From Swiss-Prot:
Gene that this polypeptide is encoded by: VEGFC
Name of this chain's protein: Vascular endothelial growth factor C
Gene3D superfamilies, per database record: Cystine-knot cytokines
Residue span(s) of the pro-peptide: 32-111, 228-419
A GO MF label: vascular endothelial growth factor receptor 3 binding
PROSITE patterns: PDGF_1 (PS00249), PDGF_2 (PS50278)
Region spans: 4 X 16 AA repeats of C-X(10)-C-X-C-X(1,3)-C: 280-362
UniProt-annotated location(s): Secreted
A Pfam family this chain is assigned to: PDGF
């Protein structure tokens, strides 16, 4: 297939993806804003779709190989396809069976690119046209602007200069580093006063190239130190946050949006898109090294913490002990976060809870009350002082009345009353 034909197919698919269709805005998107309050105005479904479509268009225009193109359109299936190629061929397996839930148009388009010869042919043609140093012949006289009565033999030399196509009309293929080659030629001047004179001339030879914008070219030409300039990207006031499951970060509106707004599909209302981009199932992803479905984000048994273990089928941390609420006993409940039975008993103020025994325990005792000069009350679990029945109205000088012994005692015996 010719490269132009491939681009025509890709453009038609892009147009299909950009066609507006009836669709409801994701209700949960409002809860996952970054850098904005919940009270801020949410973009409507049309705005979100427009940004998503623009992102898709920019990604398609910026791809520079078949691998990048397929990664944008079919990320999970493309991983599986490359895995199967490394293992010796595309075989129908459990993961590929999920294709049955896709739309017929999408299956046909994806299946067309599973032909290895087509992919290889397109990729070879693509590589030939990329921006890179290419061997060219340059006219020596035109290169240096010599007088019309002077010419060189051979008239041309072979050097490397940057050439090829860029992925955007706003970019041009330019050299980022240059070396100089010395070549020996015959210089002839007419009228001929002497024979051809051997001369050594240095020619610029491009060693590396890059697609650059006009602004980057201007900066590089006018820079004292030649260096590549990083492309400027739009910056969000808030940092790129980790989005919830099935949501992706959008740099244009600086918030999380549902993945379905970003995914390529011929039918905007197809609710089976999520499975198309997730052939391994929920909480799993394809490991390109082993070609096996593994838990996302490198989840391992050690990541689950105490009292939990990793369920490799669901890729979720589950409780080891398999306890049920009925097994916890009276006044206890099963805590799914800690995977343990926790005490839920409510105790009176003067009988604090002992979490280990899950019992209300009295903190006072007859011995403790006696040391305070009080008596112990069993029903209330508290110390109390019995009132004096024969209280004296006055004590002699140097004495004071003691509520503890109900008599006058020397004042220096008096100690602060204990509650």
């Amino acid at each position: 297939m010719h490269l132009l034909g491939f681009f025509s197919v890709a453009c038609s698919l892009l147009a299909a993806a950009l066609l507006p269709g009836p669709r409801e805005a994701p209700a949960a998107a409002a809860a996952f804003e970054s850098g904005l309050d919940l009270s801020d105005a949410e973009p409507d479904a049309g705005e979100a779709t427009a940004y998503a479509s623009k992102d898709l268009e920019e990604q398609l225009r910026s791809v520079s190989s078949v691998d990048e193109l397929m990664t944008v359109l079919y990320p999970e299936y493309w991983k599986m396809y490359k895995c199967q190629l490394r293992k010796g061929g595309w075989q129908h397996n459990r993961e590929q069976a999920n294709l049955n839930s896709r739309t017929e148009e999408t299956i046909k388009f994806a299946a067309a690119h599973y032909n290895t010869e087509i992919l290889k042919s397109i990729d070879n043609e693509w590589r030939k046209t990329q921006c890179m140093p290419r061997e060219v012949c340059i006219d020596v006289g035109k290169e240096f602007g010599v007088a019309t009565n002077t010419f060189f033999k051979p008239p041309c030399v072979s050097v490397y200069r940057c050439g090829g196509c860029c992925n955007s009309e706003g970019l041009q293929c330019m050299n980022t580093s240059t070396s100089y080659l010395s070549k020996t030629l015959f210089e002839i001047t007419v009228p001929l006063s002497q024979g051809p004179k051997p001369v050594t001339i240095s020619f610029a030879n491009h060693t590396s190239c890059r697609c650059m914008s006009k602004l980057d070219v201007y900066r590089q030409v006018h820079s004292i130190i030649r260096r590549s300039l990083p492309a400027t990207l739009p910056q969000c006031q808030a940092a790129n946050k980790t989005c919830p499951t099935n949501y992706m970060w959008n740099n244009h509106i600086c918030r999380c949006l549902a993945q379905e707004d970003f995914m390529f599909s011929s039918d905007a209302g197809d609710d089976s898109t999520d499975g198309f981009h997730d052939i391994c199932g929920p909480n799993k992803e394809l490991d390109e090294e082993t070609c096996q479905c593994v838990c996302r984000a490198g989840l391992r048994p050690a990541s689950c913490g105490p009292h939990k273990e990793l369920d490799r089928n669901s890729c979720q941390c589950v409780c080891k002990n398999k306890l049920f609420p009925s097994q916890c006993g009276a006044n206890r409940e099963f805590d799914e976060n800690t995977c343990q039975c926790v005490c839920k008993r409510t105790c009176p103020r003067n009988q604090p809870l002992n979490p280990g025994k899950c019992a209300c325990e009295c903190t006072e005792s007859p011995q403790k009350c006696l040391l305070k000069g009080k008596k112990f009350h069993h029903q209330t679990c508290s110390c109390y002082r019995r009132p004096c029945t024969n209280r004296q109205k006055a004590c002699e000088p140097g004495f004071s009345y003691s509520e503890e012994v109900c008599r006058c005692v020397p004042s220096y015996w008096k100690r602060p009353q204990m509650s």
